[in-house]
Amino acid sequence: MGFTTGREFHPALRMRAKYNAKYLGTKSEREKYFHLAYNKHTQFLRYQEQIMSKTKEKKVGVIFGKFYPVHTGHINMIYEAFSKVDELHVIVCSDTVRDLKLFYDSKMKRMPTVQDRLRWMQQIFKYQKNQIFIHHLVEDGIPSYPNGWQSWSEAVKTLFHEKHFEPSIVFSSEPQDKAPYEKYLGLEVSLVDPDRTFFNVSATKIRTTPFQYWKFIPKEARPFFAKTVAILGGESSGKSVLVNKLAAVFNTTSAWEYGREFVFEKLGGDEQAMQYSDYPQMALGHQRYIDYAVRHSHKIAFIDTDFITTQAFCIQYEGKAHPFLDSMIKEYPFDVTILLKNNTEWVDDGLRSLGSQKQRQQFQQLLKKLLDKYKVPYIEIESPSYLDRYNQVKAVIEKVLNEEEISELQNTTFPIKGTSQ
């Protein structure tokens, strides 16, 4: 039952008026109720007109960008634009060929998919999701910028129609785009920080020299740039202490070994209850720690133990490898892997059982065998001196942060120096 758009009674009000006219006594009383019903209907129409008027007056803005990657300059522009409109639509533009070239010319660890870029934007603006809307525009087949404005504008207008919004203003930081926006989209153009006075950064600068512009990369995009350094070795090889030292010195994050926490939380602190089905749970818990460390890292994140080590323990204690761990090893590679030789003093902390020299050597060989099997390049630190190990790993990290080549260090060992201390 819909309301009428003209001045005649709504059917429900007409029926109510007829009812009152039939069952209420005098003519004057009937006229009074007809008049009352008419007034109510008139008030409703005025209210409806006010709502429609407000809807028409709503100011809608739009922003276009590749966001490859998104950075704080983009975020600032979006929030400034949002303060000037009632509703803002952010369009993430993609072109398969162009985006592939951008990736190959970058220092990004892996190529972000369209879904990755949409996810960045949706995560950043999730608390304004009813006012800031994220859309995707496919630009494949359209001549490259700055050409192709006519074809591009037609695709944009189609998107506006499909997503049911009509912007009146477009926001941009590129002065050269003002005239084309006005000509091809017929929209008012507002330039936001065109001289880069507040945020002197661009996606191009971040792609090519990410560490130099690290402070401009939001945590959502950092996993595509942050370096991960995995420190692995057998029991009591000094991994955890070394990881903590490195994270503190380089002012960044680390991911602790989740397996120890799993034993305390799920097994009551005793590994005798460990079983084959526990290893995937430990790997998933460790991956959560790694994800958090990378997202909040300062250029580099240190990882205490990798999935190859988890697989080695599974083989050692359960007599066979786990296919889930095999998948984790392949799916989550690390940028740098450092293997500590198992030649430091063995300390029994209640969760260790491979304490004999023979057991330690056998486990070390198993780690090397698995590293070779999965074709993981690694740097082996042989010195039993904790100080030497610390300084040698620091030297590797300095090379990584300076974006120097470390391939000559991989699959080699540092010379033994000093004694255990």
Curated annotation (Swiss-Prot):
Entry binding sites for NAD(+) 1: 64-67, 71, 98, 139-152, 172-174, 199-201
Superkingdom of origin: Bacteria
SUPFAM superfamilies assigned: Nucleotidylyl transferase, P-loop containing nucleoside triphosphate hydrolases
Region entry Ribosylnicotinamide kinase, spans: 225-421
GO cellular component: cytoplasm; plasma membrane
A single GO BP: NAD biosynthetic process
Known outcome of mutating residue 352 to A/C/M/N: Complete loss of RNK activity, no effect on NMN adenylyltransferase activity
UniProt KW keywords: ATP-binding, Cell membrane, Cytoplasm, Kinase, Membrane, Multifunctional enzyme, NAD, Nucleotide-binding, Pyridine nucleotide biosynthesis, Transferase
Cysteines paired by S-S bonds: none
Region: Nicotinamide mononucleotide adenylyltransferase, residue numbers: 57-224
GO molecular function: ATP binding; nicotinamide-nucleotide adenylyltransferase activity; ribosylnicotinamide kinase activity
Enzymatic reactions: beta-nicotinamide D-ribonucleotide + ATP + H(+) = diphosphate + NAD(+); beta-nicotinamide D-riboside + ATP = beta-nicotinamide D-ribonucleotide + ADP + H(+)
Bilayer disposition of the protein: Peripheral membrane protein
Subcellular locations according to the entry: Cell membrane; Cytoplasm
Activity control note: Feed-back regulated by NAD. At high levels of NAD the RN kinase activity is inhibited.
Pathway: Cofactor biosynthesis; NAD(+) biosynthesis [regulation]; Cofactor biosynthesis; NAD(+) biosynthesis; NAD(+) from nicotinamide D-ribonucleotide: step 1/1
Primary location class: membrane
Binding site for NAD(+) 2: 254-256, 289-292
Pfam families found in the cross-reference section: AAA_28 (PF13521), CTP_transf_like (PF01467)
EC number(s) given by UniProt: 2.7.7.1, 2.7.1.22
Function comment: This enzyme has two activities: nicotinamide mononucleotide (NMN) adenylyltransferase and ribosylnicotinamide (RN) kinase. The RN kinase activity catalyzes the phosphorylation of RN to form nicotinamide ribonucleotide. The NMN adenylyltransferase activity catalyzes the transfer of the AMP moiety of ATP to nicotinamide ribonucleotide to form NAD(+).
Record family assignment: In the N-terminal section; belongs to the bacterial NMN adenylyltransferase family. In the C-terminal section; belongs to the bacterial RNK family.
Self-association and partners: Homotetramer.
Protein name in UniProt: Bifunctional NAD biosynthesis protein NadR
